[in-house]
């Protein structure tokens, strides 16, 4: 037994990552299989003891067991308490195990995140180091350039200083030469005076002297001219002239011994000084010298030929006249002038002998010195130029050496970086190899169920984060809060559990002492593996319905699909016998990698679906074979299997149009106060009424037999399900980025859009159908306390949230300007609509022969009058006797015929809100009221509410609207039957920062969901009757509610569990988790099906229709439990079992948006009205969502089946909103 318990715990325990849901009443909830087996053990013991006591009482007497009874009860209570303690400990162990797994996964996640952050930090540090190194290299290059510029600047300063020193030396030389010149001039003057004196005494020698003077003058002519080659500074002279000059100088120097110190010594000293100065400035390099460098050289005369010969190595350039040449030329002119001025006679011989010898000797010496000085200066200049060139060359070479050194350092740094990069790449290669190994091991674990795995793989976590990133943020918080809440609840309710167990045991054994009420049935053992369903009915025992597992059951329990159904018609019966389903399957991505991965996932999904043993696939549904639970419930009406009859996009022309909500049209009512109906009598939907309203509302009116008959008919009509009272018309709200549109379709002909018109620029969040004014509505209006009290019906709230506050709001009447602006706005809207209609009419019609894509024909059981037919542009039906290939072509058209009033082109009479209406709520707070009979596009009333409108319901001649600020707006009719939108009541249900997500009508009361609470409100008195917590955590909001019979099914945000509550006692009856079922049917989460969230919920055809966030559609047949009193028709409890659940292989790519159920056909009676009977009509269940998917498609057939239209992409095909319609027979 313990082994079986452990196995059951392992198979049915909470999975890692899934949310655990806890109820409020342990007697009416199913926690796990082990809990039920523990209770069944106690029940078995109690049943066996009960039988023994019964035999003892029958054989002996009641006194035998009176003393033994308390002891046995105490023993059973202790045993029950021990079992419950064991259950709580098992729950705590499971919670601790889940916490441990979550902590491990969180630790691994944090560890990987830390590794990633460290890796990013290292990369940032590497980038910073690289930038710093680059900046450092730039700084070093700038510093080297600065050093080079400083060196050049220093060299230029040194060169400037040397030039200044040279200039100073030249000035000194000039001063010395000037002083020497003055001395020479004085000596010359003295010599001339002496010569004059000598010429006066030696007159006899005049003739000879004159001749010698002519010869000397002839020789001196080249020298005396200031324009000669020497006087003008040329370095090369004529040889003849140089020889003559040397001869003269030699003669002069030998003849004169008594003069002043020789000029040659001073010039030699000066040349030596200049040579030493030049030697200090010149570099130590060999160069052709133009003059001797040794101070001990021979006299000037022997050096002259050498200088002349060497002068050919340099350019011959003209220099300025030196000071001596100019002065010597002036002296000759002055001597001639003196000779002319003085009239004294001078002997020519004396003049020639003295003047010529001295003059020519001194001039030659001075000339040689000057030439040597010029040559030395030219050599010095040449050496300085060479020195400067060498300095510049050295600077260039130094800069190049620095640049090469920097390049070498940069190459070394790049080499070290490349080595580091190579090491990093090697490490990454090692990590990649390890990851490949891990992925190989993870792929081997893909077929292992989640319950048997130790943790989630990285691939699964990545898929979950990608598909449900908006829910993953709060998953850990919700699980932690659930765990804490469960611990607190378990600690608080231990005493309550003991008390309840004692009461149940005493109540169980109390029947022993009442022989008249002694049961005749044995207690059924609860050994089934499924959940138990119990009802609290008197002293009857609890019945346990087993849930057969997959693959159990023999051939006798096989489901009969065709029992009670018409025979299958052949395919040649026409287009009405075929289901046209274009395979508009959209791609999720355009890249090859994503496509290959998706094909692999679909292949695994298809393989998983095909290996499901023990289930039957029929009409696109996965059906259980075992019918043990159905045989145990004879009151159950499953109604066969839903058959798909239609699947296509809602609007082919608008691929980006998204569906939001839809509602079936209720055409009942519509009577004025005088008993006149707004629907014409010739219409097949015209109601039948022969009694005036005044006769009913009048207190003196007699109750005739017709009124009683009509009342009985109304009662019989109310006993039917609400969806059976609807017509087959459906209003579907769609929205784009620009505006929201309503499309009116007939569910019998879903391919035909009867009308489509815009409503507003905001999104339409909800829609509801409200029947017209009935006779009872006028009686309620006159007798209502709300109408009598008016604004007096107000009530203050309780607490800080003002819970239950009722306030009356009256809308101010509009001024004339506002009315004119509204009329002008309506006129512009009508013009825009007409322009849109004209543009649509001008579009080319699609030919009937043009295919719209690959289609798939599925045979159905009977021809449907509402099957999609081929339509022409004028709305008439074309010939159906075409080839079988033409049946794949489908044309979507919009009928201009109103089937209710039988009018064309919107040529209907004026409508009012007395008749049936459609109420639409927008996101911007506007509430719109349109007629559902005629002139659908015209808005009858509209009002701006304080916040967004989220839900609308109609009950007890009132319309209740749920707002996003936690308030309910209640509207009522006026005395003339029209709806009053100028005044309404607001009921506050909680914190205004949170919204009322959904509304539900259960009986005559409203169930409003605010966060995790459900408030039951009386729509007449506006009082809060009761409130209950659907979930222990406030952040877990109630999202959907569906009422039927005596129960209300509730779904929670971020939760895959449905909860059932009793509408009368508000008790929690059952919990149903759909996540294990979806995981079992569609795999272990490859496509994200393991994280199931409920987005659409509806009860219809005795089935619970469930739509999930990933497009999966589930239909669960309900097992109704009969109430205690048969007089209450609404007392059936709609329990269900997931073992009988049916999963549709036709689904959506995104969340399921809505379910709508309408009657399939309503045949008009002979009197012109609709005939309503107690028989259950066949129903059409419509589902809407984004995209279409078939979970059975093989590999890449889904991508290959897509045929794109012109100017259309695969992404646009996936954006379309699809409608899927099933036919459900209830006969």
Curated annotation (Swiss-Prot):
Record-linked PROSITE patterns: RH1, RH2
Domain RH2: 453-524
This protein's GO CC annotations: cytoplasm; Golgi membrane; membrane; neuron projection; presynaptic cytosol; trans-Golgi network transport vesicle
Subcellular location: Cytoplasm
GO biological process, any: vesicle-mediated transport
Keywords: Coiled coil, Cytoplasm
Comp. bias intervals (Gly residues): 526-540
InterPro entries given in the database record: JIP3/JIP4 (IPR039911), JIP_LZII (IPR032486), Quino_amine_DH_bsu (IPR011044), RH1 (IPR034743), RH2 (IPR034744), WD40/YVTN_repeat-like_dom_sf (IPR015943)
Entry GO MF terms: JUN kinase binding; kinesin binding; MAP-kinase scaffold activity; signaling receptor complex adaptor activity
Effect annotated for changing residue 983 to G: In RNA edited version
Bias kind Basic and acidic residues: ranges: 807-817
Composition skew (Low complexity), residue ranges: 290-308, 541-550, 879-889
Domain annotation RH1: ranges: 25-113
Coiled coil feature spans: 84-191, 363-489, 814-849
Region ranges (Disordered): 1-22, 281-323, 517-572, 804-851, 863-889
Keyword Cytoplasm applies: yes
Cell cycle listed as a keyword: no
Short name of one Pfam family: JIP_LZII
Protein purpose: The JNK-interacting protein (JIP) group of scaffold proteins selectively mediates JNK-signaling by aggregating specific components of the MAPK cascade to form a functional JNK signaling module. May function as a regulator of vesicle transport, through interactions with the JNK-signaling components and motor proteins. Syd is required for efficient kinesin-I mediated axonal transport.
Family membership noted in the UniProt record: Belongs to the JIP scaffold family.
Known partners and oligomeric status: Forms homo- and heterooligomeric complexes. Binds the TPR motif-containing C-terminal of kinesin light chain, Klc. Pre-assembled syd scaffolding complexes are then transported as a cargo of kinesin, to the required subcellular location.
Name recorded for this polypeptide: JNK-interacting protein 3
